[in-house]
Amino acid sequence: MRFSQRKGLVPATKVVQRESIDDDLRASLWNLLTLFYWRKFQGRDEDTYRSDEVAGSNLEVLMYSIWINHFKQPIDTIELYWQNCLRRLRDYFFDGQWYEVYDFVEFIAQNGDASSRDRFIEACNKHLERENSAYRFVNGQITEITSQQEIEEIESAIQRSDSFPGGINALKGRARVNVQQD
């Protein structure tokens, strides 16, 4: 607990963020995107005038996927240089509605570098919990939850149902219905 919370100057706990994202949560999620994905940018190895072009970089395929499948915009609107592209992504992220932020984070988790996926999702869940969000990643999707116990129960049930053909889809549907009814 911070000094200001102990002194009663600011609330000790935040209101659950169900249909909103405050600045702290938004910044936390952006920082995770930066640490797990954006900072890993590597331009092409060729001798070129600039090495920060998106084309030929390790993030080129992800940028195409974002523009084609998430933004649904023409790929010729992707910025040529990484810093400009990153600025555009950042503006979208910080200017977007709360649900657009979750859509974007979920999209990156599902389409970004697979080697970072599990650690990224784990880090997101820690920050979502810390910032009192009503959402967590469950089975690769951002889902509304009510408690840590509920997350563990859903994930455990999904893992158990993998041994029963067809069971996973029924369980996933039931979990979504139960969580949304709260």
Task: Name the predicted role of every residue range.
Residues 1-53:
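Long, contiguous, compositionally biased segments that the model treats as domain-scale units
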Residues 43-173:
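Internal, Lys/Arg-enriched amphipathic helical interaction segments that engage polyanionic partners
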Residues 174-178:
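A cyclin-like helical interaction fold
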